[in-house]
Swiss-Prot record:
It catalyses: (S)-2,3,4,5-tetrahydrodipicolinate + succinyl-CoA + H2O = (S)-2-succinylamino-6-oxoheptanedioate + CoA. InterPro entries: DapD_Trfase_Hexpep_rpt_fam, Hexapep, Hexapep_transf_CS, THP_succinylTrfase_dom1, THP_succinylTrfase_N_sf, Trimer_LpxA-like_sf. Belongs to the transferase hexapeptide repeat family. SUPFAM superfamilies: Trimeric LpxA-like enzymes. This is 2,3,4,5-tetrahydropyridine-2,6-dicarboxylate N-succinyltransferase. One of its GO terms (biological process) is lysine biosynthetic process via diaminopimelate. Its EC number is 2.3.1.117.
Length: 280
């Protein structure tokens, strides 16, 4: 999609988003409906994405988030079926009409009862175990989303990344947050961890089981003694821990960077790549 078309879509979305409170489902402008659907279709196909790295900096396209919110504003709930189960929602599932050839050609594995909403992008050579991927999320190639993990709206999961069982990656629609959560390329997120509120996990990082990071979580580097917030530097190995209060009477949870990724760390998580090779 060329820049002129993107700017045209953005202009229309911005215009209608200002008037969101006045939009009625009984009288929706055709231009609005078509524009919103075009944005959602392009998110679904990976042509558009909510966040992208430009000049080594993550940029969030706020207008695309607004398009998703408008989609829910103008769309009615409808009955959906899966076997004997019944669902009632606004957003269809991504793969409901896809053929066997579609999955084979793209080397995508979807294990029941995984749910991927339409408007999420799933790249080639990916494995989606029984998990949940929300609208606007972007899952890049070579990545596995493991059992009972949840990928929130507009989250970005990079290439060759493993999101372990029960992990939660926060979204940005409910509640509305400024920036999506970003997991960059070649990361390993340990089971039952939670990353939310626009936190960025930079490439080649490994998080142990049960690491919780939000914007207010202290991230403590054991080697330097430095504390920062909102991101994990590239190549970090992170475990859950705590820091004492100034008076020594209590302690507060934090994420601790214990070292940088080395060959020993890589060997421990190499089994995931072997499993994917044999499963495709």
């Amino acid at each position: 999609m060329n820049e002129n078309n993107i700017q045209k879509l953005q202009k229309i979305i911005e215009h209608y988003f200002i008037k969101q409170q006045n939009i009625s489902k009984n009288n929706i402008d055709l231009n609005l409906r078509n524009t919103v659907q075009e944005v959602i279709d392009n998110l679904n196909n990976g042509i558009l994405r909510v966040s992208e790295k430009i000049n080594n900096k993550w940029i969030t396209h706020q207008w695309i988030k607004k398009a998703i919110i408008l989609f829910f504003t103008i769309t009615n709930n409808k009955l959906m079926t899966w076997g004997n189960a019944r669902f009632f929602d606004k957003c269809p599932t991504k793969f409901e009409n896809k053929s066997e050839e579609y999955f084979k050609n793209r080397k995508i594995r979807i294990i029941p009862p995984a749910t991927v909403r339409y408007g999420a992008y799933i790249a080639n050579n990916t494995v989606i175990m029984p998990s949940y991927v929300n609208i606007g999320a972007y899952i890049d190639t070579g990545t596995m989303i493991d059992t009972w993990a949840t990928i929130g709206s507009c989250a970005h999961i990079g290439k060759n990344t493993h999101i372990s069982g029960g992990v939660g990656i926060g979204g940005v629609l409910e509640p509305i947050q400024a920036n999506p959560t970003i997991i960059e390329d070649n990361c390993f997120i340990g089971a039952r961890s939670e990353i939310a509120e626009g936190v960025i996990i930079e490439e080649n990082s490994v998080l142990a089981m049960g690491v919780f990071i939000s914007q207010s979580t202290k991230i403590y580097n054991r080697s330097t003694g430095h504390v920062h917030y909102g991101y994990v530097p590239s190549g970090s190995v992170v475990i859950p821990g705590s820091l004492p209060s100034e008076d020594g009477k209590s302690s507060t949870y934090c994420a601790i960077i214990v070292k940088t990724v080395d060959s020993r760390t890589k060997n421990k998580i190499q089994i995931n790549n072997l499993l994917r090779e044999y499963c495709n």
